[in-house]
């Protein structure tokens, strides 16, 4: 089957922003104007096409990244609508991993919010080119120029306006296109009657100022244009457009557009900008991968290269288990056998579908540059690489943050017991930030995630989709343990002689604090075979397993580096099990001597309230052991940035509403782990041992 769209005419884009910037509404308008839907759905009415889970339609927020294929002016556009709530950061993260370009949506009133910064950092991590759409220009308090400056100041983006609004708030009636130097006036509510006119006289000076900035920015992308600019020659529209494209794809320019998706203004011009400035799969660097022998390799966006695809999302579905994939090279065919190179397992593709939110279109194949979903992949999880059997390669996987909050769940009846384990398995396959553990002592099932809303929605899905009734415990903080000082030559010796074959394992280790985020590191410096090679692995495994439960309060031990320096063995009595136990004993003994401490997750909390309430809010954050980092006031609104322990933040959404008469908003995301103050740590440790 031949390719329908040439690769140069494919755009894989995401729509990303902070909550309430209008991402889902923007997506709906794109689908309306590109002919996928014939009636516009609204988020606040619960009818948006991309918000298709019950919870999304009820809450008016986008939880999972819905993938949709559409077209505009002979270009195939694959869109992922991502959530703006920080509890669903993994959805944004995995979308960024598979996209070639992003539309970053900002609210013209709220401007650059904390979550905007998080999304921007994620796009930076994957070097995704982006254009910005300053939305809600019809709202009271809308200010395009303020948000444009915030992008430059807070995001350190080279934000270059390529449009200017004509009017704002209730008087927002059109857009100036700086590249064409033309004005577009909207004459009806549907945004379909657009009149192209000269630029209004009262905007001429402002247009000249921003046009000059645009020309200066594009001239810097090309030596020939720079010479032309310095010689005082005007740049042509085509030269400006071409240089803007070059700068956007290189990540040195972010074109800034404006409009009101809700009022149907500016969306078609934004689609033109997607086609004009965001890259085709052939214009982004080839994907990096690793061969089975460890050598690095690249795969180019080309149908004739061997297959390389990344699974970026798993979803339980009435049709079966859907695996969303981005095909980077080659062709993925229905009915074919493929290799999951990450797990070295052969799998069969039974069906391939293109997504129109919760509607599916069966296809025979997905080609390089395509986003789609496969059915039939039983063992494939998020982050796995799918390849041809004869040309295995492992692509760089996703960055998956650790969960910071957990709750215990218990089935209400015996009948719910089996259903609960199936539901938890299915949900954890879909969402790698959702973890399930069974406490070996209490046999209690504990689920962990990225925040209260995250777990609340997952418990809600267990009831709706899997019909599981469950009791949910109070939220628990994911504490960790670590050490503060290095220790050397700590022994772990396991000897058991009771007639017949005995047991003998003996190791000597050094233990030191590791770099933050490294977890457990192991190095062997054994020389001369004092510990045979076959026993070094088991000794390491024993230490690693020992880290699962720290000595202070049973929380996982992190950021430690163990070095095996010496040991001994017995020709007859030594075994892998004996060295595993000896490794575990050595690590526990070393931790005892290395000043163990308890760590707690610190959250980056940003609060926005009318300035009358700021004193109360700051006092409350300090009472929660918070550290105030910055404070600013703008147009009667005060913003406070702080770091606060997660343990003190449960129920904060309710508290801030009552303290500000419902007018305060906040965002919270994980920042880092920090040592718990001694008095607080003593209480936590006592509680863990049943003494409190």
Swiss-Prot record:
Keywords: Cytoplasm, Elongation factor, GTP-binding, Nucleotide-binding, Protein biosynthesis
GO biological process: ribosome disassembly
Organism: Nostoc sp. (strain PCC 7120 / SAG 25.82 / UTEX 2576)
Protein name listed in UniProt: Elongation factor G
Gene Ontology cellular-component annotations: cytoplasm
SMART domains assigned: EFG_C (SM00838), EFG_IV (SM00889)
Ranges for domain tr-type G: 8-282
Function: Catalyzes the GTP-dependent ribosomal translocation step during translation elongation. During this step, the ribosome changes from the pre-translocational (PRE) to the post-translocational (POST) state as the newly formed A-site-bound peptidyl-tRNA and P-site-bound deacylated tRNA move to the P and E sites, respectively. Catalyzes the coordinated movement of the two tRNA molecules, the mRNA and conformational changes in the ribosome.
PANTHER family, sorted: RIBOSOME-RELEASING FACTOR 2, MITOCHONDRIAL, TRANSLATION ELONGATION FACTOR G-RELATED
GO terms assigned for molecular function: GTP binding; GTPase activity; translation elongation factor activity
């Amino acid at each position: 089957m031949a390719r329908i769209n040439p690769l140069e005419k494919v755009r894989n884009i995401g729509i990303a922003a902070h909550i309430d910037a209008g991402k889902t509404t923007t997506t709906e308008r794109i689908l309306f104007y590109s002919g996928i839907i014939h009636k516009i759905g609204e988020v606040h009415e619960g009818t948006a096409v991309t918000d298709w889970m019950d919870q999304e339609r009820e809450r008016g927020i986008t939880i999972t990244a819905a993938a949709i294929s559409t077209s505009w002016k002979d270009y195939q556009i694959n869109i992922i609508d991502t959530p703006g709530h920080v509890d669903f950061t993994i959805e944004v993260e995995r979308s960024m991993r598979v996209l070639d370009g992003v539309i970053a949506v900002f609210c013209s009133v709220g401007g650059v919010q904390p979550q905007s910064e998080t999304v921007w950092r994620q796009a930076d991590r994957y070097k995704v080119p982006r254009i910005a759409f300053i939305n809600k220009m019809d709202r009271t308090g809308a200010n395009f120029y303020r948000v444009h400056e915030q992008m430059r100041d807070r995001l350190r983006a080279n934000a270059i306006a390529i449009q200017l609004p004509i009017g704002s708030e209730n008087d927002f009636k059109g857009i100036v296109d700086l590249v064409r130097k033309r004005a577009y006036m909207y004459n009806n509510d549907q945004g379909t009657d657009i009149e192209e006119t000269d630029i209004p006289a009262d905007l001429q000076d402002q247009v000249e100022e921003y046009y000059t900035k645009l020309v200066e920015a594009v001239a810097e992308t090309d030596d020939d244009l720079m010479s032309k600019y310095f010689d005082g020659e005007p740049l042509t529209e085509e030269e400006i457009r071409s240089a803007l494209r070059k700068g956007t794809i290189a990540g040195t320019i972010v074109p800034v557009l404006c409009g009101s998706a809700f009022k149907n203004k500016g969306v078609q011009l934004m689609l033109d900008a997607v086609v004009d400035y965001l890259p085709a799969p052939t214009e982004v660097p080839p994907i990096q991968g690793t061969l089975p022998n460890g050598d690095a390799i690249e795969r180019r966006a080309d149908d004739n290269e061997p297959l390389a695809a990344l699974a970026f999302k798993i979803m339980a579905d009435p049709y079966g288990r859907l695996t969303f994939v981005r095909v980077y090279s080659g062709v993925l065919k229905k009915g074919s056998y493929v290799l999951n190179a990450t797990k070295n397992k052969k799998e069969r593709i039974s069906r391939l579908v293109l997504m129109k939110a919760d509607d599916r279109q069966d296809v025979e194949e997905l080609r390089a540059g395509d986003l789609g979903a496969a059915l039939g992949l039983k063992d494939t999880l998020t982050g796995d690489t799918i390849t041809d059997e004869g040309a295995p390669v492992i692509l760089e996987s996703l960055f998956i943050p650790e969960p910071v909050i957990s709750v215990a769940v218990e089935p209400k009846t015996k009948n719910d017991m089996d259903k609960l384990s199936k539901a938890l398995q299915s949900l954890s396959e879909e969402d790698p930030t959702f973890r399930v553990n069974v406490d070996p002592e209490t046999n209690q099932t504990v689920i962990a995630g990225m925040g209260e809303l995250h777990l609340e929605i997952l418990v809600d899905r267990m009831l709706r989709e899997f019909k599981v009734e469950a009791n949910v415990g109070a939220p628990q903080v994911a504490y960790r343990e670590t050490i503060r000082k290095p220790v050397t030559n700590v022994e772990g010796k396991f000897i058991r002689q009771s007639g017949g074959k005995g047991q003998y394992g003996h190791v000597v280790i050094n233990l030191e604090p590791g770099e933050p985020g490294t977890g457990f590191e192991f190095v062997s410096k054994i020389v001369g075979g004092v510990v045979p090679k076959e026993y070094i692995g088991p000794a390491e495994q024993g230490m690693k397993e020992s880290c699962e439960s720290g000595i202070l309060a049973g929380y996982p031990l992190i950021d430690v580096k163990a070095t095996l320096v010496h040991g001994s063995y017995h020709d007859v009595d030594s075994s892998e099990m004996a060295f595993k136990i000896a490794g575990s004993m050595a690590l526990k003994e070393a931790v005892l001597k290395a000043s163990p401490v308890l760590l707690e997750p610190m959250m980056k909390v940003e609060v926005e309230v009318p300035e009358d309430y700021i004193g109360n809010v700051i006092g409350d954050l300090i009472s929660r052991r918070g550290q105030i980092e910055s404070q600013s006031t703008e147009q009667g609104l005060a913003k406070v940035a702080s770091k606060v322990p997660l343990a003190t933040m449960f129920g904060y959404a309710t508290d801030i509403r009552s303290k500000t008469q419902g007018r305060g908003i906040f965002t919270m995301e994980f920042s880092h782990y920090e040592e718990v103050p001694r008095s607080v740590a003593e209480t936590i440790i006592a509680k863990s041992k049943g003494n409190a």
